[in-house]
Amino acid sequence: MKKYFLLTVFTLATTLWANAQNLDKMQWFNEPGSYTIKNGKLEMDVPAQTDYWRISHYGFTVDDGPFLYTTVGGEFEAKIKVSGDYKVRFDQAGMMIRKDPSDWSVIELKEPIPFLWLKAVRRLDAIELYYSFDDKEYTMMRTLWMQDNCPLMVGPVAACPDGQGFKAVFSHFKVKHLPDQRRVEWLMNNQ
């Protein structure tokens, strides 16, 4: 009985470890001046006057917020827990999925909350974006098109376009591989 229990615990621990990302081994795009990575948690001082902003009627583009990423190919589910000591309007922290400088989306919150879970599910040429307040019940906020079979950069991101900076905390980041739907369907039809 004990052997089975130890094997089950080891298998569960190995599975959890394999699905989690090691933040220490990820790459920075616009590394912040001050951050720590410890026990699977990233705490960063988000620099002032940083943002991700695409071309609009305002006439400028900005691409200088801190973004810690891993490159992921194929179909996947990415999830992260985000919190921030937001100070002024437009302070932001979340998860970015990036192919190149092109698109972004926002969840508007009417009141401050202690934390938020974000989840992205990539299937074929679509990415579904979800949020949750408890990591149990997720609400879809958007579906977007993304060319399939191209690698994407995925990870925690923050920006402070208006203020003097703030502290953001990211934890429980993991990317789980999902089987390619076309291959699964082909295998089922060609047995």
Predicted regions and their residues:
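Extracellular glycan-recognition regions
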Residues: 21-191
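Bacterial Sec-dependent N-terminal signal peptides
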Residues: 1-21
